[in-house]
Amino acid sequence: MSPVCRRLVMTVGDSRVGKSTVIKLLIELFLSQNQTVKIYNHDNRNKFKAYEGIVPVESLNFFTDNPDLVLDDLLNDSLDVIFVDMPGQYIQETCNYIYEADFFTVLAELNWKLTFLQPISHRSDCMEYFLQLLDFATDNANYVIVKNQHFDTRFKEYNQLVQQKLPLIGGTEIRLTALHRDHYQGMEHLSKPYSQCFHEQSLYVLYRSYIYHWLKNFFDAVKNNQVASIYLEAV
């Protein structure tokens, strides 16, 4: 067993709220800190194709394939962080997968910590999924909410249902600032890691500047939040 506590980060919640985007941003942050990362991707749309030459990316249907593939990697001493990008909306199936794999026990025995990372939009479904997950996992995991300002800046449902509860369970929130759709699409069309996009000469200088500051703002949001910096980084 490794004496160092490592981190498994599982993205959960609604569909199309920015889960893969947040993972890509965190990959950039971890790689800048010389941490070794692996991704398990439930989606078959190759969302992480731009990163395949940088970090291991493995496709896995968590509801039909063998979950031991993920469990086996917990024995890999070379890994610092494992991302598991769960499918959106399937929160009950996600809980069932964790229960059937006895995930909480295995992680504790192998000295891994679990973080549930949930980007949210303005939709009430996001909060319903989170509360269901919290009721299931209780204190077996850490919790980070990412307020994706691409959708809204007010987050009324979050403020009413979750915001006051989050610190009581040791959870925290961070903010992902909005990036204009044209800038984001221009970056995505390059099919390159985000950190390479603001050096890309084919993009307008203004686009590159906005992309650079968008990345920097997110990195600062993680680093300046003491709780998030623990829950989202191997320590």
Language model: regions and residue ranges:
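Hydrophobic anchor at the beta1->P-loop junction of P-loop NTPases
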Residues: T11
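Walker A (P-loop) phosphate-binding loop of P-loop NTPases
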Residues: S15-R16
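Conserved lysine of the Walker
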Residues: K19
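Hydrophobic positions on the alpha1 helix immediately C-terminal to the Walker A/P-loop
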Residues: V22, L26
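Short beta-strand-centered segment that lines the nucleotide-binding/catalytic pocket of NTP-utilizing
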Residues: N34-F48
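P-loop NTPase switch/communication element
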Residues: R45-L60
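Switch II (G3) loop of P-loop NTPases
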Residues: D80-I98
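Conserved catalytic-core segment of NTP-binding enzymes
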Residues: Q92-M187
